[in-house]
Curated annotation (Swiss-Prot):
Class-III ADH is remarkably ineffective in oxidizing ethanol, but it readily catalyzes the oxidation of long-chain primary alcohols and the oxidation of S-(hydroxymethyl) glutathione. GO terms for cellular component: cytosol. Zn(2+) 2 binds at C99, C102, C105, C113. The gene is adh5. It is an enzyme of class 1 (oxidoreductase). This is Alcohol dehydrogenase class-3. Gene3D superfamilies: Medium-chain alcohol dehydrogenases, catalytic domain (3.90.180.10), NAD(P)-binding Rossmann-like Domain (3.40.50.720). The keyword Hydrolase does not apply. Its cofactor is Zn(2+).
Length: 379
């Protein structure tokens, strides 16, 4: 029986309040309105960004809400006026949309899009309302995606149609972390062949930077992390050497000083994949004078500020930032999926655990314990 135009009752992991475990609830999902798409989510990754909002540290965090932003699913129904997505399409929800008409999309200078930014930041659909209810209460959306639900509703401009032979339990992870790191090296920094790269933080994003650097032809890729259990995966993903700053530094040397010493004046490119403002400074200051480029990928706590001596920039170092790897979400993500399908991008190797929806809190636990690169939840 068709569910088109009808309210769907399904399971979702609801975040009723900050700092509390998610609760599996029966929720009601309204039909898509004009310009919207309703998706049956099959798989979703669990990311540190979900945890950040659940912790109560996110200034845009609104409760109760349905978290999740690394999803993969199939279009169940479409609203009036939707033309680029059809029922049955395999899609990845996008937390950075691509409308193609705003000044950001038409600038050819950024992958950001302003079309629905205000309402998305309020946990709402573009018309200022939500599509979720639970126990008679309105439930807010998260990052415009809310993939911790068996069904979700997105604006059409927040859906990337993907090839049907791409396994959704793997490519769902391209909705955030892997693409973020890979694109930071390929698109934002534009790492050059034969260059030296330093990566601070070897989680899923940092390992993806390594993949991007390899794809660009970098000669030397230095992975930096206090947790040496990450060095094995780091090697598998392309790092050529490693530094543990808690034990490997010469006496009296900072990590940036040590990197400058061992790279003949500094690295060509560095990437901060942690979200620590002190590490961001180190990542800039380990860059080579005259041309070194440091890209901030990690998300720092709200209100945190970065600092360095202006002379670091005056003498030619460049500080950049990257969101979703600079990847235009609807038009460029399919080519990254193609790269995975052509076995030129590792994705399967990130999946450490797979859980059913009712064990989603365990996925958060193993992430906090540093035991997983990514956990995938089967909805």
């Amino acid at each position: 029986m068709s569910t088109e135009g009808k309210v769907i009752t399904c399971k979702a992991a609801v975040a009723w309040e900050a700092k509390k475990p998610l609760v599996i609830e029966d929720i009601e999902v309204q039909p898509p309105q004009k310009g919207e798409v309703r998706i049956k989510i099959l798989y979703t990754g669990v990311c540190h960004t979900d945890s950040y909002t659940l912790s109560g540290s996110d200034p845009e965090g609104i409760f109760p809400c349905i978290l999740g932003h690394e999803g993969g699913g199939i279009v169940e129904s479409i609203g009036e006026g939707v033309t680029s997505v059809k029922v049955g399409d395999h899609v990845i929800p996008l937390y950075i949309p691509e409308c193609g008409t705003c000044k950001f999309c038409t600038s050819n200078k950024t992958n950001l899009c302003s079309k629905i930014r205000i309402t998305q930041g309020k946990g709402q659909m573009p018309d200022g309302t939500t599509r979720f209810k639970c126990k008679g209460k309105e439930i807010f959306h998260f990052m415009g995606t809310s993939t911790f639900s068996q069904y979700t509703v997105l604006p059409e401009i927040s859906c990337c149609v993907v090839r049907e032979d791409a396994p959704l339990d793997k490519v769902c992870l391209l909705g955030c972390g892997i693409t973020t790191g890979f694109g930071a090296a390929k698109i934002t920094a534009k790492v050059e062949e034969g260059s030296t790269v330093a990566i601070f933080g070897l989680g899923a994003v940092g390992l993806s930077v390594a993949q991007g650097a390899v794809d660009c032809g970098a000669k030397r890729i230095i992975g930096i992390d206090n947790n040496e259990t990450k060095f094995g995966p780091g090697k598998d993903f392309g790092c050529t050497e490693f530094i543990n700053p808690s034990k490997d530094l010469p006496e009296g040397k900072t990590i940036q000083q040590h990197l400058v010493d061992i790279t003949d004046g500094g690295v060509d490119y560095s990437f901060e994949c942690i979200g620590n403002v002190n590490v961001m400074r180190a990542a800039l200051e380990c860059c080579h004078k005259g041309w070194g480029v440091s890209t901030i990928v990690g998300v720092a706590p709200a209100g945190a500020e970065i600092s360095t001596r202006p002379f670091q920039l005056v003498t030619g170092r460049v500080w950049k930032g990257s969101a979703f790897g600079g990847v235009k979400s609807r038009s460029q993500l399919p080519s990254i999926i193609d790269k995975y399908m052509d076995k030129k991008l590792k994705v399967d190797e990130y999946v450490t655990f797979t859980y059913p929806l009712n064990e989603i809190n365990t996925a958060f636990d193993v992430m906090h314990e540093g035991k997983s690169l990514r956990s995938v939840v089967n909805l």
